[in-house]
Amino acid sequence: MMLRIVLLVAAAATTMAAQSTGRQTRAEMTNYEETSTYADVMFVIDDLVKSSPLVHAESFGKTEEGRELPLIAISDPKVTTPEAARRLGRPIVFVQANIHAGEVEGKEAILMLARRLVSGDLKPMTKQMVFLIAPNYNADGNEKITPMNRTAQNGPVAGVGTRENSKGLDLNRDYMKLDTAEARSLVGFMNKWDPHVLVDLHTTNGSYHGYHLTYSPILNPNADPRLIEFTKSKMLTPIRQAMLKSHNWRVYDYGNFSPEDGGGRENSRVDPANPGNTTWRTFDHRPRFGNNYAGLRNRIAILSEAYSYLDFKGRVAVTADFVEEIYKSVQANAKQIMTLTAQADRALTAPAASRPVELGVDFSISSSVDKVDILVGDVTKVPNPRSGRDMLAMTPSAVPVPMKEYVTFAATRSLTLPKGWLIPKTLAESPRLAAALDRLRWHGIKVQEFASDQQLAVERFTIAELTKAPRPFQGHQEARLKGTFDRVQLTVDAGSLFIPGNQPLARLAFYLIEAESDDGLVTWNVIDDGLAVGQTYPIYRVVDARAITVKSQ
């Protein structure tokens, strides 16, 4: 795999030699009129590898069109394997960019930060952390650069790539269903390297607010609450203060303006003198989104959204500064981050009797008790000479307006995390569940096989309601089940499958497997084929796992 990367880098370097100005990105070389192509990214990576003994480059998978997905590892001493990284006993921090290839400043910013880690002012950090960087996740979409994509975005004027991958799918909706080669590659990377902190770089448009960048921690309440609280209070709040004090950037919790009774409908423009019942509202709790998915893996996650109407150079700069402040926060809190993530894993692998964990299946967004000041901004039109269309540029206006904010979620109905889940042998061998088992294993979830026939107390789910979305989304008609549980004794045949509830990824397993999950195997039509009202859901909740004997792995 490394040979393929080297060959691709060599080809990119050959084609770029005439335009090269050392390790600069395409954005820097063109005064921020253009963004980097795949070849440009590979050229910069090649230069980093050649210029420093601290840099390792490899591929963590392939795109749908067969492009290698580059990964950079920077550390002193150099690490080339996950095992070597873990032996250092340091936080492993992963930053990915360009999941939406029209949102390109993260790709440029993280390559510039990589230079500083290798030979600049950030180099001392390489003795304290392991830095992992995936600068061009949606590599296929990145090759479809045109000025006619995201035309209202304030640069680069030469254009950007597409939001979707080559299959027309949004990679930031694919973390659970894993329909794309890219998402399967990324989850495989997470299983392999298991970073403590994950950062996802985006651009946001939407409402005309007064922030240069907005961010989000984990929004799903089923993540370990200690990780959520730590990210908010010990990382993001000090980072917000540092961004203003040290860099003069205004940053805040991600949101858009929405009327109090608007059902989540967004308003682009708000009149500061007459805001009415406007609120500030975040996006979504579901783990189809990367920051929420990482939370279910017991890891810290931060979403970064540079403001689309800030000019391209400014977006690159604010993103770079934000990631730098995240790095500094991890550096300052290294011991606590490693302790908290390890505790989150251990809390799920402790003896069953000591770990009752309640996890949500229904959720609602929560309002702040009091109104808070949210910065209301505005935009003006500026012409793009390449597209012939107007871009929108943020104005200096940033008026604080008191309003309620909705930036957290809470579970409204929960179930106890079971001792595990049972798939009877007759069902486990059916084509119907093959895709479900594939996905569980792709996610890194442990699946075991019963060694002998056994009697087992289980909870059986009977379907009372099955609803499907009227319109397809991401190639699926999202499904939802409602029903009731009853407790029964089953004779379980040898060869039946058991998914333990006492494994580090149990929160993720719960979200994928549970019949009433709002973003699981049922949601994405992996397991709903043939289900009907009155039928039994084919996966059972195990009540008592003490007597279970499984085959050794």
What are these regions (language model features)?
Residues 1-9:
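Sec-dependent signal peptide recognition
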Residues 9-18:
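Hydrophobic h-region of N-terminal signal peptides that target proteins for export
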Residues 18-553:
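Structured catalytic-domain cores with a bias toward divalent-metal coordination
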